[in-house]
Swiss-Prot record:
This is Signal recognition particle receptor FtsY. It comes from Helicobacter mustelae (strain ATCC 43772 / CCUG 25715 / CIP 103759 / LMG 18044 / NCTC 12198 / R85-136P). Its main location: membrane. Its EC number is 3.6.5.4. It is found in: Cell inner membrane; Cytoplasm. The gene is ftsY. PANTHER family: SIGNAL RECOGNITION PARTICLE RECEPTOR SUBUNIT ALPHA (PTHR43134:SF1). Keywords: Cell inner membrane, Cell membrane, Cytoplasm, GTP-binding, Hydrolase, Membrane, Nucleotide-binding, Receptor. It catalyses: GTP + H2O = GDP + phosphate + H(+).
Length: 292
C-alpha cells in the first residue's frame, strides 16, 4: 500500500546514511522523525517511554501505543450510514485535489457495482465544473451541474433529489474551497450542510475533508478550521506519491482525532488506497531501520 513512502524513505536514507540499523539513539531518531514531518509533540509522545538506544521492535511498540492512545480504531472511526443514497460532501481548499478525489471515489464505488451520481457544487469556479464533467465522462457516471455562479446549495439539493429519484447508491458533491473571504466560505458551507440535511429529511450523511499531503503538518491549521466549522467525519490525504512528508500522517491523526479514510497516490482514477494502520507502521519502520 505505502509505496508512496519511497520519497520519505529516501529522505531518511539521505539523513541516516545507508545500511540496516539494529538500534538508533533517541536524539537521532527525533531528528529522523522531524525530517519526515512528524510534529514534535507527537515525537515526544512516541518516544517518552523508550530507552536511549531504540530498536525497531521498541519503536513499533511506541507507534502501536500512539494509535491506541489516540483511540484511533476504538473511538475514532468513520460512521456507518446504512441509508441510501449515501451522500458525501467533499470539503477542502482549492488545489488540495478535491475534484480528482471525487473521481477516484466515484470510480471505486462504480467498480464495486454501485450507482453513482456526482454534484458539481463548486459553482464559483467554472474550471471546477468543467473538470468534474470531464471526469464524469471518463469514468461513465452521471453528474448534476449548473451554470457558473449559481447557488451551490440549490445544486446540492437538486443533486440529492435527482439521486434519490434515480435510486443511486452514492452521491458525491463538490464544494467551494475559496470565496472572497473566510466568513463567506463558512456561511456558504454551513448553508449547504443545512440544505443537505433538509433534502435527506435529516438522515445522516458524510462530510469528508481533502488535505494536500505535500503540505505535511502545515495543513493541520486549515483542517482544524474546517472541522470546527462543519464537524468533519473523515480525511482523505492526496498527492502522497510526491512528498517526503509521510510522517505528517501521525501529526494529522493526533491533531484532528479523525479517521484517515484513504490516501491519493497519483493522478489516475485508480490511485486511491485505503489507509491501513499496520502497513503504515511497517513502512515507516522499514524506512528508518532498513535503509538501503
Amino acid at each position: 500500500m505505502f509505496d508512496f513512502f519511497k520519497k520519505t524513505a529516501q529522505n531518511i536514507s539521505n539523513f541516516l546514511g545507508g545500511g540496516a540499523k539494529q538500534q538508533i539513539e533517541k536524539e537521532l531518531l527525533e531528528e529522523v522523525l522531524i525530517e519526515a514531518d512528524v510534529d514534535y509533540e507527537v515525537i515526544e509522545q512516541l518516544l517518552q517511554h523508550l530507552p536511549q538506544n531504540i530498536t525497531r521492535n521498541q519503536l513499533e511498540v511506541g507507534l502501536d501505543r500512539f494509535f491506541r492512545g489516540e483511540s484511533y480504531y476504538d473511538k475514532v472511526s468513520l460512521k456507518d450510514i446504512p441509508t441510501k443514497p449515501l451522500v458525501e460532501l467533499i470539503i477542502g481548499v482549492n488545489g488540495a485535489g478535491k475534484t480528482t478525489t471525487i473521481a477516484k471515489l466515484a470510480k471505486r464505488y462504480k467498480d464495486s457495482g454501485k450507482k453513482v451520481l456526482l454534484g458539481a457544487g463548486d459553482t464559483f469556479r467554472a474550471a471546477a465544473i468543467d473538470q468534474l464533467k470531464l471526469w464524469s465522462e471518463k469514468i461513465s457516471v452521471d453528474i448534476i451541474s449548473t451554470q457558473y455562479g449559481s447557488d451551490p446549495s440549490a445544486l446540492a439539493y437538486d443533486t440529492i433529489n435527482a439521486g434519490s429519484a434515480r435510486k443511486m447508491d452514492h452521491i458525491i458533491i463538490d464544494t467551494a474551497g475559496r470565496l472572497h473571504n473566510q466568513t463567506n466560505l463558512k456561511n456558504e458551507l454551513l448553508k449547504i450542510t443545512r440544505v443537505c440535511s433538509k433534502a435527506l429529511n435529516n438522515e445522516p450523511y458524510r462530510k469528508i475533508l481533502i488535505l494536500d499531503g505535500t503540505q505535511g503538518s502545515s495543513s493541520i491549521n486549515q483542517a482544524k478550521i474546517f472541522h470546527e466549522m462543519l464537524k468533519v467525519d473523515g480525511v482523505i490525504l492526496t498527492k502522497l506519491d510526491g512528498t517526503s512528508k509521510g510522517g505528517a500522517i501521525l501529526s494529522i491523526i493526533h491533531a484532528l482525532k479523525l479517521p484517515i479514510i484513504a490516501i491519493g497516490v497519483g493522478e489516475r482514477a485508480e490511485d486511491l488506497l485505503d489507509f491501513d494502520q499496520k502497513d503504515f507502521i511497517n513502512k515507516l519502520l522499514d524506512s528508518i531501520f532498513e535503509v538501503k
